[in-house]
């Protein structure tokens, strides 16, 4: 850090904010396409020596800006199936609140093996089934399929509040299994991701676990990154989203395995 201060000539406090904004831009870019931006922004927050719970809370504040920026872009381009998404929003909101309340008292150690196995299976599935998520085959989601989507939205909301990074990726998986292509699945996922971030942030704010300054600095970067990422996804379509999806799930899988082994 000393050499950066010497090169830039910036005071330490300002340099931290600049670095967080840069990390936020990268996180927002990736997250707006396939999710997983927390793999960048959460470690960046932790490098500032914030307590883990405050780092998570501050990350939720920054994620609001990134998810909001991407959501607006997708909505303006009519990529969101709002007739379905609006039915899932309450479940994601409540689930995220429950997960956030749990994270302050329960270790995520027991959840990680399940996530690792799930990510591994889905990554292999996407690699070998090359047409998966390439064509938008969805129709009106009703009946049993809708109830499954509601249960999934609740579960993902809990996961987002409890662990966080990768929520958007799992949401995309769920929407693709419903019949959406990668691009429309990403658009739908971003609306729910914004909702879960908001719910979790409200709990963290209530508990006093948010560094407003760091969250806003990272959020400023996220706005720019999410704007660029969502526009690129719309321009390039599902083929780009698929490639980035595989890259992010692979990195996420490796990180989760490393973290899990480190705790044994």
Task: Put a short name on every predicted segment.
Residues 155-165, 200, 205, 253-264:
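Hydrophobic alpha-helical transmembrane segments in multi-pass integral membrane proteins
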Residues 50-59, 83-87, 179-190:
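Membrane-interface alpha-helices at helix entry/exit sites of multi-pass transporters
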Residues 68-79, 116-141, 253-264:
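Transmembrane helix exit motif
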Residues 17, 60, 116-119, 123, ...:
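Residues within membrane-spanning alpha-helices of integral membrane proteins
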Residues 57-110, 117, 197-243, 247:
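Selective hydrophobic functional segments
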Residues 21, 25, 29, 60, ...:
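Residue-level signature of the transmembrane alpha-helical core
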Residues 2-51, 136-186, 216:
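Selected transmembrane alpha-helices and immediately adjacent juxtamembrane segments
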């Amino acid at each position: 850090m000393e050499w950066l201060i010497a090169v830039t000539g910036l005071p330490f406090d300002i340099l931290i904010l600049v670095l967080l904004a840069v990390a936020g831009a990268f996180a927002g870019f990736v997250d707006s396409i396939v999710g997983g931006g927390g793999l960048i922004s959460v470690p960046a927050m932790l490098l500032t020596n914030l307590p883990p719970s405050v780092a998570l809370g501050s990350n939720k504040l920054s994620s609001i800006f990134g998810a909001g920026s991407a959501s607006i872009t997708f909505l303006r381009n009519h990529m969101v199936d709002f007739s379905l998404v609006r039915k899932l929003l309450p479940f994601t909101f409540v689930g995220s609140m429950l997960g956030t309340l749990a994270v302050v008292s329960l270790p995520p150690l027991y959840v990680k093996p399940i996530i690792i196995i799930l990510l591994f299976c889905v990554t292999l599935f996407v690699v070998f089934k090359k047409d998966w998520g390439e064509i938008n085959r969805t129709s009106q989601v009703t009946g049993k399929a809708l109830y499954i989507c509601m249960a999934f939205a609740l579960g993902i909301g809990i996961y987002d509040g409890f662990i966080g990074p990768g929520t958007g990726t799992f949401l995309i998986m769920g929407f693709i299994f419903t019949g959406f292509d990668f691009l429309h699945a990403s658009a739908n996922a971003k609306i729910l991701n914004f909702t879960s971030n908001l719910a979790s942030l409200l709990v963290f704010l209530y508990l006093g676990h948010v560094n407003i300054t760091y969250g806003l600095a990272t959020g400023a970067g996220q706005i720019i990154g999410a704007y660029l990422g969502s526009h690129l996804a719309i321009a390039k379509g599902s083929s780009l989203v698929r490639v980035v999806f595989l890259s992010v799930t692979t990195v996420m899988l490796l990180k989760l395995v490393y973290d899990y082994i480190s705790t044994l």
